[in-house]
Amino acid sequence: MSASDLTSVQAGAPQGRRQILVTSALPYANGQIHIGHLVEYIQTDIWVRTMRMHGHEIYYIGADDTHGTPVMLRAEQEGVSPKQLIERVWREHKRDFDSFGVSFDNFYTTDSDENRVLSETIYLALKEAGFIAEREIEQAYDPVRQMFLPDRFIKGECPKCHAKDQYGDSCEVCGTTYQPTDLIHPYSVVSGAAPVRKTSTHYFFRLSDPRCEAFLREWVSGLAQPEATNKMREWLGEAGEAKLADWDISRDAPYFGFEIPGAPGKYFYVWLDAPVGYYASFKNLCERRGLDFDAWIRKDSTTEQYHFIGKDILYFHTLFWPAMLEFSGHRTPTNVFAHGFLTVDGAKMSKSRGTFITAQSYIDTGLNPEWLRYYFAAKLNATMEDIDLNLEDFQARVNSDLVGKYVNIASRAAGFLLKRFDGRVQASAMNHPLLATLRGAIPQIAAHYEAREYGRALRQTMELADAVNGYVDSAKPWELAKDPANAVALHETCSVSLEAFRLLSLALKPVLPRVAQGVEAFLGIAPLTWADAGTPLSPEQPVRAYQHLMTRVDPKQIDALLAANRGSLQGTAAAAEAGAANGNGAGSKNGKGAKAAAQPAASAANADDGASPIISIDDFAKIDLRIAKIVACQAVEGSDKLLQLTLDVGEERTRNVFSGIKSAYRPEQLVGKLTVMVANLAPRKMKFGLSEGMVLAASAADEKAEPGLYILEPHSGAKPGMRVK
């Protein structure tokens, strides 16, 4: 792939010093930054630093996405106002981005005066142009909380596979999408009440307008990623299909956000004001720096505008956002760059396995943020492919590439140069053929970065590092140093090595900015730019005492990181044992803690205090977990806690189990359900009869604060008698 093939510069873009506005998606202001988020911010930051090193005028803009029902409810749960919540989360997010070297020119908030004014301006322009429609719609309404419910705040039974506790827009078990009205036995996740249907006036952006379709068909042809283009064409359909639907841009009070002009009690949906927040953050920066904001966003602007996003929000950024801008009289994005998702060790991030890793826990564990920047960069390319953080590979790659190949070059040469040659390089050594090779590679490496082919850039850089190490191994400076007669050769070897190290540092600077800063201080040079490839070290400027730039990853640090992020899970064996000891046939197991369902509170506290002994896989293998079907269920006379379950576990006869779940279920609710039982628990003679096992149920660690018991139900397809393993 030649540099001419790296087409990140759009046709017609200004040459020379370019003016570029860059954004990453806005993190939502009700949770922590985790390593999945960091993929995008690191990817964007590397690109921004690359362009800064070219000398372009570039601004990297971000903000917290602050509006919506989830923020409002989270604040209520914490006993604070939404503004207090988002101010605290902003500080946490800013801290995390700073820790990982994400170099925003401005990190702001969507809950700002700038964003309110811009959102209103764009809305009113769209309304004036005939793109806003007003309609009566019927929605789910929580009669207890007196609020309309977003789809994700309604749960119930999937109408297709009958999985319980599925969201109001799609089933996570079978993948079916549907309307909230299709759910069986729906309930509000806010209050638990059954929602009722209620009508309300809403406002829509008329994406179905033929003008939108015509514009978007033309705009999509400029997207850089074929996957994005294909997806957009799928959404648009063939000409005349009219597949685009109007977009509901309003929400009813109570809602944390901006009220729609001329519509009391109606608020902009968060996805309208969130992308406008890009411009609001930039406007805030322009006002502080004296920049001409309008010159960057007006329709005839010659500036460039790029959005880095995850592929899950492509729909909003390639349909709604460009159409909003086009028909409100603003410039549209030059391009949108989408990336894939992150897995850890080949699986989704998991709290129970400790792989749902927060940015702060990574820092608190003592891991170097530039290790993660390097590893993500090595995996990233210009496509929407998912990437995997394999923790063994992470350790091996960092230790091999960054310490073994790269940093080691400086440590091998600096000592000799300082002791023997006053820290000054040999002028003639700067013409060595190896250095010419490195200098010649720098433009292509920079081009790979600009094309978002970071993996290619780093592979080429490490190939060059291998060549430099081969040169050092061949020259053997440690042998040359033994004989004063070899002083000239030793001086040359050390000088070539340090200049090569400078060039490798230049190639790695977008990825390792803090290491590069340390290198610049060590070599006594100005901040490196791409133009400096041809400006070698000077004998006039002695290098300084070498300071270690990077250490190796210690496996114990990885273990500590996983432990810090792992949910407190009690072993199944301990839960079963506790249940049997208390004479109950029901146990529980979940990420918040596990205990027998009818244990006294004191026993529950002991079960959840993290003091349970670690068990081996052999111990766990002793437990026979089976799928069981509840064929009959009845209350136990004389007990206010127990239900008597008759279970089919795939044997010739059914089993009788007493379970302490009466407070959570009526007998008729359980008949016909599948659940999970401990099938090899010793039968226990109880007052009410013989209990021949134990069914599993989940509960919170503190049942007084968070009451409720929930039996485990397998996905559809499981059959009585199947082993759970």
Curated annotation (Swiss-Prot):
It is found in: Cytoplasm. It comes from Burkholderia pseudomallei (strain 1710b). Residues 619-725 form the tRNA-binding domain. This is Methionine--tRNA ligase. A motif ('HIGH' region) lies at residues 27-37. Homodimer. It is an enzyme of class 6 (ligase). Is required not only for elongation of protein synthesis but also for the initiation of all mRNA translation through initiator tRNA(fMet) aminoacylation. A motif ('KMSKS' region) lies at residues 348-352. The keyword ATP-binding applies.
